[in-house]
Amino acid sequence: MEKGGAASLQPGSNSDDDAAAQQQQQDIPMYFVSVNKVPTQVICFGDQCSGLVATDDAKPVVLVIPGNPGSIEFYTEFMREIYEGLKGKVIVWGVSHAGHVAPPKPMQIPNVEDHPTLYSCEGQIGHKLSFIKQYIPSGAPLILVGHSIGCHMVLEILKRAPELNVRKAFLLFPAIQSLDACPRVSIINPLVTYLRPLTVATLSALRLLPRGVQNLLIRLYIFLATACTTPHRSSLRGAVNYFRPECLMACFVFTRDIIQNVRERDNETIARHADKLTVYYGQNDHWSPVEYYDDMRRTFPEADVRLCERGFRHAFVLDRGVDVGSMVRGWIETLLR
């Protein structure tokens, strides 16, 4: 789909959604577009667009880049809070990672085994750059919001596309260094490598269960992994994608790649763009511990580096998306004055 066209725009519910789930999604401006030949789920809050191409190149575009797994549906309430809180002063868009969300029929995700480079970390960075160049006017003020591994992608966008009019970049709970040293890697790594066929087969079989049972299993997993007891329904909808083998495979390729390759923090890019960055670390973050915050403060004493004092978890989108969205909305409001 070229800039200005809308031929590939598709409604956002996936092929397995039942009537109740579709009803819940009616108020979410969700679509699928083709980016690098991969059907990609996007959410677009804002009336200044024509088929997802910005028509007002003076209005700032807030672009949200997710963590992993990368369904942008996890971020629905976070994005809505930013958009509604700023009363239409900005456009708020979010783009899923390539292959992480099942598109509606007849669209299909390119086979992961035949096209692994589409779903690697490098492929996902290229996917975000292509989305920006395809749908956002080159002169439009751009505010980047990355979460977790999405922060790594934000830094890569700043490095690789200096022509973009990036006004600000917010890095939330950044996973930008030493991912192989994180404590959960010892559990995750086998699941995405030699146990991958068994993991994919087992989780894919669960899609045959009724949606209510799937949601119960998702809630149980979320509780065991994060201690969250009240995940928002948008989190449940986003998680259902990972009962699909093609989405699991894309997610696993990406996970393995970032564990292997996201090691050294890109101090050069951070230094070059320090005036544009706000970096927000968590108090109890297994992907980015407080020691990384301390080191960032020592290395960049003049940068805007903050430590969470409100008890937000790394996976804040599960149940605190509105609260974190309100915080980010306040930061953006200050920027717009």
Question: What is each model feature region?
Answer:
Residues H273, V279-Y281, D285:
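Short beta-strand/loop motif that positions the catalytic acidic residue
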Residues D275, P301-R337:
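Catalytic active-site module of serine/aspartate enzymes centered on a nucleophile-bearing elbow/loop
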Residues H97-I143:
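Active-site loop/oxyanion-hole signature of alpha/beta-hydrolase fold enzymes
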